[in-house]
């Protein structure tokens, strides 16, 4: 069972004590903090897990042959939903840094998407390098890709999944050699 969480230490502890897999909707740095809490709390519950074991990081991907092509994909597949959907979460949460950008051109939302630490925008090698760097400190067992199916052509979604599976995941798998769960109990 995966339990989505974004910023609550209590949610991490809840998941750890029940054996649920936390699905972190947060930056790499915040996810690393949560993974340490999860590992500590799981141990209290009788499960000796490695750091990152049973944990998942959520990422959105825009992969291109060049950085420019990846940004073009953001413009065509992600900028609209970022502007008209995700931007409202900051307002609802009462975030002081939220502002009304509803009249801003769609192109300006490309930068907003690219600056979000949950979004991976670039070439296969640049994204793989960034994730490998993060996994060296916090080797998460799972990586969750959430595509914007309504905005993104299915061929691009399928190609992104293929690139993650064949070009990115093998490098991450080298960093996540965990004991079996039976050995953790």
State where each predicted segment sits.
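Active-site-proximal loop/turn and secondary-structure-junction residues that shape catalytic pockets
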Residues: 7, 28, 61-62, 149-151
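Conserved, mostly hydrophobic/aromatic
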Residues: 1, 15, 38, 70, ...
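Hydrophobic faces of well-ordered beta-strands that scaffold small-molecule active sites
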Residues: 1-4, 22-24, 53-59, 143-145
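An alpha-helical appendage that flanks or caps ligand/catalytic pockets
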Residues: 31-140, 173-184
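A conserved active-site cap/scaffold subdomain adjacent to cofactor or substrate pockets
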Residues: 7-29
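Glycine-rich, proline-tolerant flexible connector loops at the mouths of alpha/beta enzymes
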Residues: 26, 146-157
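Short, acidic/polar
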Residues: 5-13, 126-133
